[in-house]
Amino acid sequence: ANYLGRAAKEIFEVNGNVVYGFLDDNKSLHNKELDETFILGSTDDDGFLKLIGKKCEAFIAVDDNRLRKNLVNMLHEVRHVQPVNAVHSNALIAKHVELGHGNFIDQGVKVGVGVKIGNHCLLQAGCIIGAEVSISDFVQIGSGSIISSGVTIEEEAFIGAGVTVVSGITIGKGARIGAGSVVVAPVKAGETVFGNPAQPIKS
């Protein structure tokens, strides 16, 4: 029941789906309403979990990758299901795109032809993904970022708002790119970069 949950709920409702409720581990929120939808219980409440895959689908609205992974694994192991995608009706996605499970694609996102998007990625409002970009699992791309054609983004990379990544380079696993940066060279796995041009930040 956070900003991402509210945004996902809006997407599902605009697309004509019924949202039955939120699950949140903050017990102080239970039985309260958020945007006219009740917070029903915790994410480990079997009374609600047993409905997933039979009576309804689920989406994991969490931007913390560690928690997101834990919840994905729980759904897979306990319910043998994968979360659905939340794709805004105003997103423009090319016909020939590969899209995995559990992805959040917000309003104004543009995805070019030949793009491959893995599982459980977050593409925030207005970001542009050029042709033949490869995006691995659990990647986050901030609002207004431009990912040029042929870029490879490895698992768990984080790209802040308003970033520009030039064509053909690789963003390594777990790399972090600060907001507003212009990336003109490959970013190593686990590296944090910032600036124009983006440079590694020394710890």
Q: Which residue stretches match the model-derived regions?
A:
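NAD(P)-binding Rossmann-fold cofactor-contacting core
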Residues: 14-33
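Glycine-rich adenosine-cofactor-binding loop
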Residues: 1-8
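Phosphate-bearing ligand-interacting subdomains
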Residues: 27-92
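Conserved acidic residues
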Residues: 20, 56-57, 101
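Short, cationic motifs built from Arg/Lys/His that form the positively charged side of catalytic pockets
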Residues: 67-69, 199-202
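Active-site catalytic pocket residues across diverse enzymes, especially alpha/beta-hydrolases
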Residues: 8-12, 75
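Structural signal for interior beta-strand "rungs" in well-ordered beta-sheet cores
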Residues: 85-201
